Curated annotation (Swiss-Prot):
Gene: ddl
Enzyme Commission identifier(s): 6.3.2.4
Cellular compartments annotated: Cytoplasm
Gene Ontology terms: biological process: cell wall organization; peptidoglycan biosynthetic process; regulation of cell shape
Descriptive protein name: D-alanine--D-alanine ligase
Lineage summary: Bacteria, Bacillati, Bacillota, Bacilli, Lactobacillales
Pathway: Cell wall biogenesis; peptidoglycan biosynthesis
Length: 348
């Protein structure tokens, strides 16, 4: 039986490229090599596409994907050279230029099926401010927030923010994930510095009320018919779950399934599925919630390309539902092909 080609794109231009490499290495080891041939391409910080490795069988645990230190620049290709008839692309890319609709649009121009949400839902979900406004409009609870746009009067924004919110306050670049560029502010001075830091990552900044809450996550899978997982909980050994805690210090553990009341489980799964459909989602997403001590649920964000590392919540949530990592990848490939066929049929 001939194998289907699975094209892995990893690296990328965003500050989350290191997470992308970790995710892609986990995917390449989880693939069912009886069914797939894996071809990998590294995208540099400058946006160059480099042909790297090919795997016809499971690589050893010691084998690593080629990155900046090991790539061969002689293998630089035109981005369109990744095209292969019948192949499916897994863009294991996080953050801007990865899960913001950019690469999705490129793959649609190439007429290649790809895993993940489409151009519209990727771009909306990537922007925290736009996502909050969409979810507010359909009645899904949001933590109180204000917005700062680069070039506006910063002092006026601080006055407005302190009139509406109380410390602690979290400041986030609108278009960034993996907690990159996020700060916790306890004073006006810290708030100003946090906004200035966020502006180094994006021109639009979300300023959000801090809440004492548990962090609960729900996995989503599907196209027209969406399935959700039982929720899992991120249990922190630190006050603030930032990039360092997530990916460097490993100062988190996970409880899967989360120990929450059944009514809360039902509410979260319903909100997750409704939000996914409202944003035009397809393929997959991870929906992140806050759960306060008094039982208030807030939907924090939808992550359209969640981490796929061996310790990432998304694959572990599905494993808890009985869907093993290799089978999850196969399901994602099937969904990608289904959406490709649907898009193509609408262009005729």
């Amino acid at each position: 039986m001939s194998k289907q080609t699975l094209v892995l794109l990893y690296g990328g231009r965003s500050a989350e490229r290191e997470v992308s490499v970790l995710s892609a290495e986990s995917v390449m080891r989880a693939v069912n090599y009886d069914k797939f041939l894996v071809k990998t391409y590294f995208i540099t910080q400058m946006g160059q596409f480099i042909k790297t490795q090919q795997f016809s069988e499971k690589p050893s645990e010691s084998e690593r994907l080629m990155t900046n230190e090991t790539i061969e620049l002689t293998q630089k290709i035109k981005p369109s050279d990744i095209y292969e008839e019948g192949a499916v692309v897994f863009p294991v890319l996080h953050g801007p230029m990865g899960e913001d609709g950019s690469i999705q649009g490129f793959l649609e121009v190439l007429r290649m099926p790809y895993i993940g949400t489409n151009v519209m839902s990727s771009s909306i979900a990537m922007d925290k401010i736009t996502t909050k406004r969409v979810l507010e409009s359909i009645g899904i609870p949001q933590v109180a927030y204000t917005v700062y746009i680069d070039g506006q009067d910063l002092e006026a924004c601080l006055v407005e923010t302190l009139a509406r919110l109380t410390f602690p306050i979290f400041v986030k670049p609108a278009n960034m994930g993996s907690s990159v560029g996020i700060s916790k502010a306890q004073t006006k001075v810290e708030l100003r510095k946090a906004i200035q830091l966020a502006l180094t990552y994006d021109s639009r900044v979300l300023i959000e009320q801090g809440v004492v809450a548990r962090e609960i996550e729900v996995g989503l899978l599907g196209n027209d018919k969406v399935k959700s997982t039982l929720p899992g909980e991120v249990i922190k050994d630190v006050d603030f779950y930032d990039y360092q805690a997530k990916y460097v210090d490993n100062k988190i553990t996970m409880a899967i399934p989360a120990d929450v009341d059944q009514s809360i489980v039902t509410e979260m799964r319903s909100y997750a599925e409704v939000a996914f459909k409202a944003l035009g989602g397809c393929g997959l997403s991870r929906c992140d919630f806050f759960l306060t001590q008094d039982g208030q649920v807030y939907l924090n964000e939808l992550n359209t390309m969640p981490g796929f590392t061996q310790w990432s919540m998304y694959p572990l949530l599905w494993e808890n539902m009985g869907l093993a990592y290799p089978d999850l990848i196969e399901e994602l490939v099937t969904l990608a092909q289904e959406m490709f066929d649907q898009r193509e049929s609408h262009l005729i």
